[in-house]
């Protein structure tokens, strides 16, 4: 039977997706693009993050640490953001941290402290995925940050379900070339990959903690979504290794959480197509062909498998694959005099409002950012990605074995949804500590939860790829439970 290489097959799928273009490339699109276009290693390397020879340099020398940075911290404090609402009762900071002084590589951050008891609450680092997408544009201004952008592209409104209600939250644009992060050596943009991103993010953290020394001993958590299913575990692993090597730069890592995360190619690809079928986006006939002829653990697919996967994309049609029940953006023009509010019906044109806001000169000045043609995602970073393990499961196992709390959550209306998390988790064969049950947020079932030894899996009802955008209250309930170390409530508070 004729065989088609994995790479050729994925390119064919990618060309089919162009038939149904999105109005604007988003984080979810970038993940899809990356999955369909990347070259897996041949033979695929399944070594854990800790075992690869190429990673020796990651742990072989102390990180670059700048001198004391109190003056920089004071300079990074934001006086006010243009268009922000009245009554802001928390401190916010933003600016650059140098991660490589020789090449002039600097990463941009935005930090919001909690409005109450910030001196005792934990520190949470948020990372968006892609690869190549901004944690400022998505995480901070569209998902879990304290503000969202009105449809006028000029003003902000408060998010009552912001995660800084329960933690001090740090948003990082990484790697260089994304958002406001940059390098004076442009060839750096062609070298981005999992290894360099983990290393730069670690160096960023060490230096950021020098700038904010009051957080050095604070409980520290990392959370992220999408391709951050790679970033977050890899950064956590890097921290653990360096904590053992260098006692003067200890980071008090307690746990990680992964949302709608891509962590294992073979099981996640199967989960993707199963999810499309169970949500009635694919026909029985196409799904049966994929089930029979597609072995996602192999490098080469048969022509029948390739054609079936292509047909799956055609059958799905022009919908938002990452919230399959949501409308598309049909009018991206800015609206004057609009005032938004946070609900479970996210405006599908929100990307455009954020882009307009973050490109305003007065906004970039207030954020202490260099003048930049800012965008949510970088095409060059995504398409030039240098290294990406086909599985992160060994790294996840390493973190569990080292006592790091680990939650994985999935919105159930995302095509990259529940099955792409369940299938990889099942391969770990962890004992169940707490059986599958519903959990509540307010008076409604927020989703379902199952507890394993060392890992908790949570679904979020009615949420797409960006869980805090589509179900902000449920996302806050979830992250609060994660930080407090308890499972979400099993009964409604009204009962």
Curated annotation (Swiss-Prot):
Its EC number is 3.4.16.-. This is Serine carboxypeptidase 1. Gene3D superfamilies: 3.40.50.11320, 6.10.250.940, alpha/beta hydrolase. The active site is at residues 226, 414, 465. One of its GO terms (cellular component) is extracellular space. GO terms for molecular function: serine-type carboxypeptidase activity. One of its GO terms (biological process) is response to symbiotic fungus. The keyword Acyltransferase does not apply. Residues 1-25 form the signal peptide. Glycans are attached at residues 117, 184, 300, 310, 336, 373. Interacts with KPI106 and KPI111. It holds the Pfam family Peptidase_S10. The gene is SCP1. It is an enzyme of class 3 (hydrolase). Keywords: Apoplast, Carboxypeptidase, Disulfide bond, Glycoprotein, Hydrolase, Protease, Secreted, Signal. Disulfide bonds join 133-377, 294-305, 329-349. Carboxypeptidase that, together with KPI106, controls mycorrhiza establishment and arbuscule development during root colonization by arbuscular mycorrhizal (AM) fungi (e.g. Rhizophagus irregularis). Disruption phenotype: Aberrant mycorrhizal development with an increased number of septated hyphae and degenerate arbuscules during root colonization by arbuscular mycorrhizal (AM) fungi (e.g. Rhizophagus irregularis). It is found in: Secreted; Secreted, Extracellular space, Apoplast. Induction: Accumulates in roots, in a RAM1-dependent manner, during colonization by arbuscular mycorrhizal (AM) fungi (e.g. Glomus versiforme). PANTHER family: SERINE CARBOXYPEPTIDASE 1, SERINE PROTEASE FAMILY S10 SERINE CARBOXYPEPTIDASE. Belongs to the peptidase S10 family.
């Amino acid at each position: 039977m004729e065989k088609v290489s994995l790479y050729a097959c994925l390119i064919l799928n990618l060309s089919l997706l162009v038939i149904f273009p999105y109005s604007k490339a988003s984080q979810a699109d970038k993940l899809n693009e990356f999955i369909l276009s990347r070259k897996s290693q041949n033979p695929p390397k399944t070594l854990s993050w800790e075992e690869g020879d190429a990673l020796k340099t990651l742990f072989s020398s102390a990180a670059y640490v700048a001198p004391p940075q109190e003056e920089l911290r004071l300079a990074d404090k934001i006086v006010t953001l243009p268009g922000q609402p009245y009554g802001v009762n928390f401190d916010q900071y933003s600016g650059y941290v140098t991660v490589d002084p020789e090449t002039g590589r600097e990463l941009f951050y935005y930090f919001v402290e909690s409005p109450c008891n910030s001196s005792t609450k934990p520190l949470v680092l948020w990372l968006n995925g892609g690869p190549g997408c901004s944690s400022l544009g998505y995480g901070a201004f569209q998902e879990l940050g304290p503000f969202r952008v009105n449809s006028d592209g000029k003003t902000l409104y408060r998010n009552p379900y912001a995660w800084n209600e329960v933690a001090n939250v740090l948003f990082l644009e990484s790697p260089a070339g994304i958002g406001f992060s940059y390098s004076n050596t442009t060839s750096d943009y062609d070298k981005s990959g999992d290894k360099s991103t983990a290393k730069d993010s670690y160096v960023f953290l060490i230096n950021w903690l020098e700038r904010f020394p009051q957080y050095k001993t604070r409980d520290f958590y990392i959370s992220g979504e999408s391709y951050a299913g790679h970033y977050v575990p890899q950064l956590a692993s890097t921290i653990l290794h360096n904590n053992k090597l260098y006692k003067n730069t200890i980071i008090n890592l307690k746990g990680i959480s992964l949302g709608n995360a891509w962590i294992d190619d073979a099981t996640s690809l199967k989960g993707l197509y199963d999810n499309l079928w169970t949500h009635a986006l694919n026909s029985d006939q196409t799904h049966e062909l994929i089930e029979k002829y597609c072995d996602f653990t192999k490098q080469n697919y048969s022509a029948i498998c390739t054609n079936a996967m292509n047909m799956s994309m055609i059958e799905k049609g022009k919908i938002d694959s990452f919230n399959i029940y949501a409308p598309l953006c049909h009018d991206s023009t800015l609206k004057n005099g609009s005032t938004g509010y946070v609900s479970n019906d996210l405006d599908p044109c929100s990307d455009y409002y954020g882009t307009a806001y973050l490109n305003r000169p007065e906004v970039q000045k207030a954020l202490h950012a260099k003048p930049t043609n800012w965008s949510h995602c970088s095409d060059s970073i995504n398409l030039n990605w240098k290294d990406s393990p086909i599985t992160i499961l060994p790294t996840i196992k390493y973190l569990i074995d080292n006592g790091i709390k680990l939650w994985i959550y999935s919105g159930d209306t995302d095509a990259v949804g529940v099955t792409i998390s369940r299938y990889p988790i099942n391969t770990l064969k962890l004992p169940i500590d707490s059986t599958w049950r519903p959990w509540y947020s307010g008076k409604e079932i927020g989703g379902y939860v199952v507890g394993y030894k060392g890992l908790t899996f949570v679904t979020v009802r009615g949420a797409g790829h960006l869980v805090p955008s589509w179900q902000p209250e449920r996302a806050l309930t979830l992250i609060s439970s994660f930080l407090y170390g308890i499972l979400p409530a099993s009964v409604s508070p009204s009962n």
